[in-house]
Amino acid sequence: PCSGKSTIAEILSERYGLQYFKVDNHLEEYTIRGAADNLPICKKQIEWNAEQIWMRDPVLQCKDEIIFYEEIFDYIWEDLNKVNQKGAVVTEGAAYFPHIMKKLHVPEEQYAAITPTKDFQISHYKEREWVPYILEGCSDKEKAFQNWMGRDSLFADTVCKECMELNYLSIVNDGGNSINEMVQIVSAHFGWKV
């Protein structure tokens, strides 16, 4: 969900000379690969239209979104390891769920989750010029948007809860901190000179 992750990762990449791997740039490819590998949620995302995706209950959407990231994570990990061979990497994306990071034994000081409050997300998504294209084909675009934001709010809540349970840093962005302040928080957490 929209929380400033990409902007923060870009700044960290430039500031510390790290490669930047943005999962969102590869989601279409991973979805196609997953569908070809008969992964159920990936197949759904390829086959379903906007109405079928966005007019569903947000709870079901959130559940599917979590499963989707679990389905494609092997592809992400494979690509991330290729990039990592070329030097240190900063990476970001909603796919980096705390339970997946724990399973991979990612140390607490090498992971931070940044999620938005629902109000922050809605206010920023309403400014995104591509949102109408995502909802194109929905019979009730306002309801579809509400469902989407509901899904992402549940998703963010799940990430925060998992972070607490697994002792990972969770930063909730309500817009109260500037991007530079958030960059400093993340840098300090990673033990990087601020």
Give each language-model segment a name.
Residues 2-3:
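ATP-binding Walker
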Residues 6:
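Walker A/P-loop
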Residues 14-63:
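Conserved substrate/cofactor phosphate-moiety recognition/catalytic segment
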Residues 46-60, 128-145:
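A solvent-exposed, charged loop/short amphipathic helix patch at secondary-structure junctions
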Residues 65-86:
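Phosphate-binding/switch loop-helix module in NTP-utilizing enzymes
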Residues 80-84, 91-137:
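ATP-dependent NMP and nucleoside kinases share a basic, alpha-helical "lid"
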Residues 154-194:
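NTP-dependent small-molecule kinase module
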